[in-house]
A protein has these predicted regions:
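Short, surface-exposed patches at the edges or C-terminal ends of soluble domains, predominantly
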Residues: 1-167
Length: 167
């Protein structure tokens, strides 16, 4: 069972993408996106500027993961990450991982698990130890900037990456 929704945007009706996602929900197992919890990360259930409800679960929002053919699940590292998680999102941890939690994350990565790590430079203290394993560190500066010459999409705006020099 699935739903073909109308959306809270200027188009209202589903496009081919949303119709296809609804059909896929009927005939196949959808990719599952896990969001790490337990360390003060951005919340997938709360509605707010700093949380991810709109991006994950919001049914009237056309571009939510739910409407684009993904299942979403919260993941706690106190136990091994389920094998059906296709990508794990770590969104701005505010406390460090315990050794057993780190082991569970390492096991997920070792079996080929995918990660998406999101952070702001002021979270360096907790994020840098995790990022260091991948040869990455947080540095001050802007790496995403909206440009006036790019037309805005009515429902979603995509920033462009820029070099630190601004060119």
């Amino acid at each position: 069972k699935t739903f073909l929704r109308v959306y809270n945007d200027m188009y209202h009706h589903p496009f081919e993408t949303e119709i296809t996602a609804a059909f896929k929900r009927l005939v196949m197992e959808l990719p599952k996106v896990g969001f790490l919890t337990g360390h003060g990360e951005r919340d997938v259930k709360k509605i707010g500027d700093r949380d991810y409800n709109t991006f994950t679960w919001d049914k009237p929002f056309r571009n939510s993961l739910l409407n684009q053919g993904f299942d979403v699940e919260e993941v706690n590292l106190n136990s091994p990450i389920p094998k059906d998680i296709n990508i794990l999102v770590i969104a701005e941890m505010r406390s460090e991982l315990l050794p057993t939690q780190k082991t569970n994350l390492d096991q997920y990565i070792a079996r080929g698990g995918n990660l998406m790590i999101l952070s702001e430079p002021k979270r360096k203290e907790y994020m840098d130890p995790l990022l260091a394993e991948f040869g990455v560190k947080l540095v001050p500066g802007i790496n995403v900037k909206l440009l006036a010459r790019i037309p805005l999409w009515p429902e979603l705006n995509s920033p462009l990456l820029e070099r630190e020099s601004g060119r």
